Amino acid sequence: MIFMTNEIVNSTSTSQKLILASQSPRRRELLAQLGYQFSVQASDIDETVEKAETAYDYVLRLAKQKAQHVLDLLPEAERVYSYVLGSDTSVVFNGEILGKPDNEENCIDTLSLLSGNQHQVLTAIALVSHAGVKGQVITTEVTFKTLTKAEISAYWLTGEPQDKAGSYGIQGIAGQFVKTINGSYSAVVGLPLYETAQLLANAGFVGSIHTK
């Protein structure tokens, strides 16, 4: 589907096509916030962490693979003018990648680790095209207040943490858990606005405001 925010949004060339390789409504909203015209195509890849893989390497690999997967699905003639943006986010505590919770117990365990502590959120972006791959990783430090088990259980019942890396969504109810954040808020949500705008500008795309 095509997602547009207004009529003036366009690319510098009508031959260029931007595709977001994600089914995340949060990433779609963030990219639209920058004023780009783009289509959305979900990417289905294996997200298993490889042996001895660091969180940095993991998120960057997934961002690239998501974008490459979508590019490979396109008819060969379309690949010449298509640019696919992939992104991946992981919550990391003491070097351990904290995935999405399978159940309430898993959520309680994860948020108990984060309670009263600082953790890192790593978000990678990658732009894949016929010209190659460009990507980077943004690291943000987040500190939580101390949480009670009752608070965590109540949070689980809201349904918000059930599809979130690290068992929380900073843009929602869990925003009240955050004491401090050092880095990019939008990266924690799922797509770093500044870095994404820079990446797309360098590829020749123009949003609401041309970024240099």
Swiss-Prot record:
Necessary cofactors: a divalent metal cation
Highest taxon above the source species: Bacteria
Site feature: Important for substrate specificity: 26, 89, 171
Database matches in Pfam families: Maf
Annotated GO biological process: nucleotide metabolic process
Principal localisation: cytoplasm
Entries under NCBIfam families matching the protein: maf
Family: Belongs to the Maf family. YhdE subfamily.
Name of protein: dTTP/UTP pyrophosphatase
Organism: Colwellia psychrerythraea (strain 34H / ATCC BAA-681) (Vibrio psychroerythus)
Classification of source organism: Bacteria, Pseudomonadati, Pseudomonadota, Gammaproteobacteria, Alteromonadales
